[in-house]
Amino acid sequence: MICIIMGSESDLKIAEKAVNILKEFGVEFEVRVASAHRTPELVEEIVKNSKADVFIAIAGLAAHLPGVVASLTTKPVIAVPVDAKLDGLDALLSSVQMPPGIPVATVGIDRGENAAILALEILALKDENIAKKLIEYREKMKKKVYASDEKVKEMFK
């Protein structure tokens, strides 16, 4: 089970990238909105009551949500910094500069799909079915690149 928490509804497009991957893999998930700054009590309630094995925290600007989530659990937390201002660098730096002992894994700016894949890789450590699906997913990606290569080679003959 994966819990996706976004700092605001404006992060929905990023969350949808993660949700699409999780649906493709048939993994149980929940999606919530809670602000580290405006509703810290809701963040705590969600984290404390969630059955999630992994959390994905999506936030822009000051992006304290991933760190707050990490402070409330010993389960893995994956940050997705959002390009809201400053090309997302403010959110990226907020996510990667965590104090010792409170780690947050961080994927690229706006990369909800990579957060989902990383969460699945964590679950795959104990779930062979997910591990097999990840291998198949990578093979599919590989085939697309080979097909693109063939197409482009033909274009420039």
Swiss-Prot record:
GO molecular function, one term: 5-(carboxyamino)imidazole ribonucleotide mutase activity
Pathway it works in: Purine metabolism; IMP biosynthesis via de novo pathway; 5-amino-1-(5-phospho-D-ribosyl)imidazole-4-carboxylate from 5-amino-1-(5-phospho-D-ribosyl)imidazole (N5-CAIR route): step 2/2
Reaction(s) the record says it catalyses: 5-carboxyamino-1-(5-phospho-D-ribosyl)imidazole + H(+) = 5-amino-1-(5-phospho-D-ribosyl)imidazole-4-carboxylate
Residues holding substrate: 8, 11, 38
EC number(s) recorded for this UniProt protein: 5.4.99.18
GO BP of this protein: 'de novo' IMP biosynthetic process
InterPro entries: PurE_ClassI (IPR033747), PurE_dom (IPR000031), PurE_prokaryotes (IPR024694)
KW Isomerase (keyword) present: yes
The keyword NAD is annotated on this UniProt entry: no
Pfam assignment, any one: AIRC
Superkingdom of the source species: Archaea
Keywords: Isomerase, Purine biosynthesis
Function: Catalyzes the conversion of N5-carboxyaminoimidazole ribonucleotide (N5-CAIR) to 4-carboxy-5-aminoimidazole ribonucleotide (CAIR).
Family membership noted in the UniProt record: Belongs to the AIR carboxylase family. Class I subfamily.
The protein, known as: N5-carboxyaminoimidazole ribonucleotide mutase
Gene source species: Methanocaldococcus jannaschii (strain ATCC 43067 / DSM 2661 / JAL-1 / JCM 10045 / NBRC 100440)
Gene from which the chain derives: purE
